[in-house]
């Protein structure tokens, strides 16, 4: 068919020149080369660049280290388009696990038509039952392999990021890894964490400038999410207003003492960021901390996140304000089930 898949973590592929391999494949009639685990191959971006420049072969490459790929991607500017595969949405989880296949909805659809959409969805599934499972086990496709070892695999994934990816791209001394793990545990057990950088530095024995650096690395690695206040604008040096685990599955993997309020907010931030972030925008500017309410989305909508007893007292008389409420199947007016924000992508 003219297509070939190779994985560069294979020892045989490690012994070859990727460019020469691609050249020979093209000479034998190859048209498309799929290259997996590309970050495991030394100077992979140079080889991809040379293939692009010298051959007519099309190349699709992928890797599981977003940090290592993004570091070398600058070599491929104007030659490649990089797509980031985010964690599964609640809707994708339902489809992957063969529970039910639903369409996704844009944010405006959910805000305006959530009652009719939820009424239709609840004819097919019990969303609250599956949502609780999703918060613990639904973010990554390897839930299909084995539920019992699911959280262990997440811990292994985080260890790989801390012990391999970060030192590789940032020249972090190995002695700092223990401090990084301490920092991550501190965040996991206190999210949504309202950061005091000085206190974090003291608790982890990391210097204040390094705390900022490490938080940025962890966010780029998709381990945490940070949120700034809109009032502070785009001040690069402004500390984050809140810190969350990137998704709730990471929280459950790191600690058994999960605050449900934290989990709700982390889910909301995760799904909004994943659904609305566009790589055509210079900054991730779709969601901020809000002065009234919890979150400001698209400079227009105010959201307060909570349990079913949450009321509008904190966002009373605020225009375009909504409650994202857990533990309800179907909402009413500006009161929207939290699980529905898992249908954005």
Language model regions located:
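Structural recognition of the conserved hydrophobic beta-strand(s) that form the central parallel beta-sheet
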Residues: 34, 58-64, 84, 324
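Short regulatory helix/loop adjacent to the ATP-binding pocket of P-loop NTPases
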Residues: 67-82, 94-99
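Sensor-1/coupling segment of RecA-like P-loop NTPase cores
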Residues: 53-73, 218
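Conserved Walker B catalytic segment
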Residues: 39-60
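Short glycine-rich substrate-engagement loop in P-loop NTPases that contacts/grips substrate
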Residues: 2-32
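Conserved P-loop NTPase "ATPase switch" module shared by AAA+ and STAND
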Residues: 26-44
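A cross-kingdom feature that marks ATP-driven nucleic-acid transaction machinery
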Residues: 1, 8, 216, 222-345
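Interdomain hinge/linker elements that couple catalytic modules in large macromolecular machines
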Residues: 98-252
